[in-house]
């Protein structure tokens, strides 16, 4: 199989990257009607598989789970997830032949063997659905011409997909139809009904393409969403301990600080996050972030270039073929970092203290969000897609670090995201070595002293204007307006 994106002429590549439209709520007036009476069979019962299935069933749809015989015989977690929630469970051979819609919600590395196994069993004219387009775009999977291929991708972890649905809301969702596989022209209707079934239409839906979803998703998760948070955690912890700050305090400040800081990001963008700082601290964070952007921009460009060219995917798939040798080694190495091995202390840290003593962390989030957004849009990805894959998902990933540090983050994200995270981290830590030499406890660990409270009015006005005028703030204000009812993470 060849990389699908690389087989397209340049003009088509650019058109697919730029495909993104925020859909009006009126476009979902038919609800789940297009899926009513259809048999939906889910393959994979992990976080996304289970929670999407629960939502679809609660929306009145017919949902069952097809699992491998060994998963059923050994009563693995996927079998437990499905059976304990009252779903019908069967083998591929038992359930796929009668399925109208097959939902492939397995991990990326399993997509090729899974699709090759189920495609011969699928009835003529059925629909195959994904929640991530890697298999189509990067692996170039060829799907039978009579099958409709769609994507419905919630922009949140599976647990949030369910939690928001139960609240009567939903999470922002991206939908797409694979243009090479829409023989009956029903792909869009099916994708819209699916998005309604999971509750996504209540939070906003982007009509996109498989290509735009994959190239933006890979970029976001490698850089700001996972790579920058891991890099920042390691560097900030080591710096604080080096400067004599109690290791338990440093560990707590970082483990729970990302979550608290990015909560402000979720509700009011980068502007609101920096507004939580005093004026002197805001200017300091702004200046640090601008310096970080200069240093890290070439690295962000490299990640985007490697994603666009397919080099990243090729390298990762070579590691798949080598039994994940690099991934597993990098995972083990992360477990041995000082931050990961140091328990959070018992000291209580107030919400505001996370901001006051975490100025550098705020700067890193700002730099990472803006760089990821700028790099994606420069590559032809539309602003709405870039927003969802940068600023929007950052609080959701930060929340996983609060639970069990970097281990939980890397366990929650996909192996694809984890692999890219490590690549970024390995390059970024040495890249920031000289920058970190000049960092002191005034920006990480202790906060600014009273003597640092002077502010130049003209400079403050300049900083505030720069914050509010960044393109990620403009598109974010519009998209967040559709998510006003989402619950607080913290």
UniProtKB/Swiss-Prot annotation:
Alphabetically ordered keywords of this record: Amino-acid biosynthesis, Branched-chain amino acid biosynthesis, Magnesium, Metal-binding, NADP, Oxidoreductase, Repeat
Signal peptide: none
Catalytic activity line of the entry: (2R)-2,3-dihydroxy-3-methylbutanoate + NADP(+) = (2S)-2-acetolactate + NADPH + H(+); (2R,3R)-2,3-dihydroxy-3-methylpentanoate + NADP(+) = (S)-2-ethyl-2-hydroxy-3-oxobutanoate + NADPH + H(+)
Residues annotated as binding substrate: 414
Matching InterPro entries: 6-PGluconate_DH-like_C_sf, 6PGD_dom2, KARI, KARI_C, KARI_N, NAD(P)-bd_dom_sf
Residues binding Mg(2+) 2: 217, 389, 393
Family of the protein in this entry: Belongs to the ketol-acid reductoisomerase family.
Protein name listed in UniProt: Ketol-acid reductoisomerase (NADP(+))
Organism: Marinomonas sp. (strain MWYL1)
